[in-house]
């Protein structure tokens, strides 16, 4: 039965269809301009950039320039890259310009599509950032598309690992900058740890287009970027705690895979208590006494490291280090570390060198970093399933862009087996059959371990020539994935390794040219060889098409439908045929943890025999339901985390804005005076409460505060004896004395040095207190959840207490800054005492009138070519004097020592 909603969609079309229809009309207007632009010479086409910029300077909007700018970029792409953006790419480009997310199928040309809004928005000169997931893609796209932008007179930079500040600053100053989300985020944090504007590398955040937007803004949303500094080395303690876990029995702990938690049972707690007591690390009577909080934290981390984290799935061991594996892409994430001691627990488990724990110096989540841009948009092959999250958190509307040619891929129903063993036997049979008929196969696995187990099975079965692509072989990723479309190729890949590189049937021309002709110079020979490679690829493509196109065979379903859709989407690009199928078992993680018991019972009733599969659309629907449940739970987690991070983010913005203001201030006298007066007011109100009797005054405490915070010795005891003196009078006298001392110091230092000192003290103190504040917020975050048991809202509690901590930090800042400024003194280093020659004197020879002492000095140093004999020196020409000792009489004849005469000007 058709619902009213379904009926309405049939008649009027979905909101997506209506939006696409409107944009298609605009795309047709741009296409109508194509003939005009084809008739322009290269010089006339290039002159369009200056013409558009002049129009913007006169007040025209980017929207009004869009048709002509898109037509210009399209024509330039045809001439420079040999590629013409289709109308659907124009539609996608408009979505990106209008702060949206363009969902385009794999192979539809997202990289080329992005050049249209990038060119248009770069005309403003405020900077456009194109964000990708790794350095390889950033460099590749900057080089390839950079030819188009350079042709149109725009500058292009690329931010990648290993650049120094000057190189980064130059790249950010370009009209268009390519870079990874990590590099951009860390540059922002590093900029906000600098002490001068000139040292900063980034410009204000204007416009960003995020490639693989779902991966960056959703999969990595929970991962904060953290710059940290090392704390004390506690590797012995981690190793000791680690020895307690392997001997534990199953009854000693409980693991909840769904919630990803591991906790000790009562029996387990008693066991580790005894072990700790024997090692001398148990304080008090019980493990859960307040003195053992840190020990409990380390024990829980060690338990999680052993029971929740799997080697070759969650991390790998490489070069004596634990390298985290991205659970969504299967890529290694070198440089990333788990926080709060978990990474050290994994290092202890795997017996590699334990790195010291780190203190957070600065941090930000991708959610909050990308929300700083004035304008944000993104593109991906799969975003529709997360449309609600993109809308709620980033205010981005997802639009599904129609394909240029109809999709010919056949998505087959899942095959479900009872056991993993049966499933793998079926997979190997299917791979053998497809391989023998010459069909290229992409096999998707969920972990390194599983990809290598499958590879071993294929070896045992005698299937040769397959490639394994996982985090271990990250360096060859692009080449392996690019050749996955060759007839008979079998490529085993973890999750979405290789995203960003197209799988083209017959092979990838660009990759083969790079690989096979790297040492062949430009010329007829190279052109001939490229033509031969093209012909070979065309022949191989025909074979692959005849075999049915690319076959995507997935060995397991992921928690997220989006990741499954990404894998499916590798097949059937640009109208090519293809097929996809998922092989599952009841022992798979998703089925075991989230699948309903009803499905298990249903399969048992059917009485499946060994190696027999069940295939039915109902199974697909039940699995999709389980995936939706997981997605909803993960969305709630991310949304909740963002609410907490927003509290810190508001404070971060205040602090970072304050730092920028300090950098720009040329005179901080008023700011410092205000801080000084606030410190004095707080001091007086604490020791002499308003309207309190004189007997209640703490004069001794006030005197001590004045000495410690203002470095002054004031006769407050005498003032207290005066008849009728009130707290305001104390306040005014202390302010007057402190202002006088500060003014005298400023006069001694001079305005330039004083401003430099004030700026340095304020910013260093602010940075140190902010770091401590981040630690305090982390501690508050870790315990505030327990307030829920007392029927109090943890988020509101966190907001209230975080604000109080922030207020305390600002009060401490005033005290620390004023205390340091009232004590600071400039110590000028005395110049070293000059070494006098052994015979200091003057002896004029009566016969010659020459200074015998000068001759003696010259004789003493005659091995030095720069020494000129006194008789050869012209008193009127310093160029003839050569090297002169500082304590010699000046050769000019003044009678003064050289250092007090001509030497003083050196």
From Swiss-Prot:
Chain intervals for the UniProt region annotation (Disordered): 868-887
Positions contributing to ATP binding: 89, 107-111, 502
Gene Ontology biological-process annotations: intracellular protein transmembrane transport; protein import; protein targeting; protein transport by the Sec complex
GO molecular function: ATP binding; metal ion binding; protein-exporting ATPase activity
Keyword annotations: ATP-binding, Cell inner membrane, Cell membrane, Cytoplasm, Membrane, Metal-binding, Nucleotide-binding, Protein transport, Translocase, Translocation, Transport, Zinc
Subunit structure comment from the entry: Monomer and homodimer. Part of the essential Sec protein translocation apparatus which comprises SecA, SecYEG and auxiliary proteins SecDF-YajC and YidC.
The protein's name in its UniProt record: Protein translocase subunit SecA
